[in-house]
Design a protein with these regions (language model features):
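N-terminal maturation segment of proteins
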Residues: 1-179
Length: 179
């Protein structure tokens, strides 16, 4: 289930297109039926808890897919950069699968961590390009709030650029294959 829950990638970015959700609907329904067929009567408590967790995750996915559709209605869904650790276990509200958690990086970056960050940053333009086609909803309040998220993300990108240029300019350009 958890492998299915991660969307497939298109041009390196998670695919949240209507076409992708339609294409995967049958597989989701099969997974749901498999879960529902399981007889948990004689299972241990911790195995039943696991079953309930997976069931709750599937219900959440289904609710997002059919009702909330944050990839259609909420520009903030496409916010990728998080400069600070959230005060909740995950992030508040729906979040995409391509987050760059800047606060998790220690500077100076090792070559591997610089490569990780570069890979995460390379996803951003493709995800935002996809957002242009996906965002067709009319949830005005989400659009108003989402604009602020992107102003903040722009500031975050400038901070990252300054920070990385100072400590890793040549290394990062090499990883991003820039002269």
């Amino acid at each position: 289930w958890r492998e299915f829950e991660k969307p497939p990638l298109t041009s390196g970015a998670p695919d949240y297109t209507t076409k992708m959700f339609s294409h995967r609907e049958e597989e989701f329904n099969l997974l749901r039926k498999e879960l529902e067929k399981m007889d948990t009567t004689n299972w241990s408590v911790h195995h039943r808890v696991d079953w309930n967790v997976v069931n709750a995750e599937m219900n959440g996915y289904d609710f997002n897919r059919r009702v909330l559709k944050p990839w259609v209605r909420d520009p903030a869904f496409y916010q990728t950069i998080w400069m600070y650790e959230s005060d909740v276990p995950a992030h508040e509200g729906p979040a995409n699968h391509a987050l760059l958690e800047f606060w998790q990086y220690e500077f100076p970056l090792t070559e591997d961590r610089a490569r990780d960050m570069a890979s995460e940053m390379e996803v951003i333009p493709n995800l935002l390009f996809q957002a242009r086609g996906n965002l067709t909803g009319n949830a005005k309040d989400l659009w108003i709030a989402g604009i602020e998220n992107f102003k903040d993300q722009q500031k975050s990108l400038l901070k990252i650029k300054t920070h990385i240029k100072k400590e890793h300019g040549k290394q990062f350009n090499k990883i991003l294959k820039k002269p």
